[in-house]
UniProtKB/Swiss-Prot annotation:
The keyword Ribosomal protein applies. Part of the 50S ribosomal subunit. Binds 23S rRNA. GO terms for molecular function: large ribosomal subunit rRNA binding; structural constituent of ribosome. Keywords: Ribonucleoprotein, Ribosomal protein, RNA-binding, rRNA-binding. HAMAP family: Ribosomal_eL20. The gene is rpl18a. InterPro entries: Ribosomal_eL20 (IPR028877), Ribosomal_eL20_dom (IPR023573). This is Large ribosomal subunit protein eL20. It comes from the Archaea. It holds the Pfam family Ribosomal_L18A. One of its GO terms (cellular component) is ribosome. Belongs to the eukaryotic ribosomal protein eL20 family.
Length: 86
């Protein structure tokens, strides 16, 4: 059984499709079991937060990265957490 991996997803998305469409580049670090789940997470995240349709999101590159290569310190620290108690 494979563990959770980190993926660096790069691409472009069309923001504001109805009013003033603007194509923007994005880079997102995603925790997932495989590439397919990482892509699905990106689609669902942009769809729910920014109301962007899946056909307006173009993923150009997806690559697996090591925990040490993550640029954001907060994400690196959260990766070390084994369990969360609420």
């Amino acid at each position: 059984m494979s563990g959770i991996k980190f993926y660096l997803v790069k691409g472009t998305a069309l923001f504001g499709e109805s009013h003033y469409p603007e194509k923007r580049k994005f880079v997102k670090i995603v925790r997932a079991l495989n590439e397919k789940q990482a892509i699905e997470y990106v689609y669902s995240h942009f769809g729910s937060k920014n109301k962007i349709k899946r056909y307006n999101i173009k993923i150009e590159q997806i690559s697996e990265i090591k925990e040490e290569e993550i640029p954001d310190r907060r994400i690196r620290e959260l990766a070390k957490v084994d369990k969360i108690i609420m």
